[in-house]
From Swiss-Prot:
Its main location: secreted. The keyword Signal applies. Belongs to the fungal hydrophobin family. SMART domains: HYDRO. GO terms for cellular component: extracellular region; fungal-type cell wall. Aerial growth, conidiation, and dispersal of filamentous fungi in the environment rely upon a capability of their secreting small amphipathic proteins called hydrophobins (HPBs) with low sequence identity. Class I can self-assemble into an outermost layer of rodlet bundles on aerial cell surfaces, conferring cellular hydrophobicity that supports fungal growth, development and dispersal; whereas Class II form highly ordered films at water-air interfaces through intermolecular interactions but contribute nothing to the rodlet structure. This is Class I hydrophobin 2. Disulfide bonds join C30-C90, C37-C84, C38-C71, C91-C104. Pfam families: Hydrophobin. One of its GO terms (molecular function) is structural constituent of cell wall.
Length: 109
């Protein structure tokens, strides 16, 4: 019994160490929406994001959803020239006039 517990503990520790850290997706994998260049990307629960969401009357399920603040679309021309000096993201909801984009994932250009 103790051998099983030790084996399981070692296996879980090895798995935790061997699991790679999440990184930004490549820009070519943006299948949920348009590429955006956002000044900041933060959790929806952050003070600035929650204030903007509240003012717009937007309710988000889950506080760990990433939102982009002050975003603009990245065009093909902008992509070729590295046209985003802030945070490039792929967001599921860009319908708020660039003020806030919802459901964002960081991408690498």
């Amino acid at each position: 019994m103790q051998f099983k517990l030790a084996f399981v503990s070692i296996a879980l520790a090895t798995l935790a160490v061997a699991t790679p850290a999440p990184r930004g997706e490549p820009a070519s994998s943006c299948s949920t929406g348009d590429l955006q260049c956002c000044n900041t990307v933060e959790p929806a629960s952050s003070p600035s994001a929650s204030t903007i969401l509240g003012l717009l009357g937007i309710v988000i399920q889950g506080v760990d959803v990433l939102v982009g603040l002050t975003c603009s679309p990245i065009t093909v021309i902008g992509l070729e020239s590295g046209g985003c000096s802030a945070q490039a993201v792929c967001c599921t909801d860009n319908s708020n006039g660039g003020l806030i984009s919802i459901g964002c994932l960081p991408v690498t250009l």
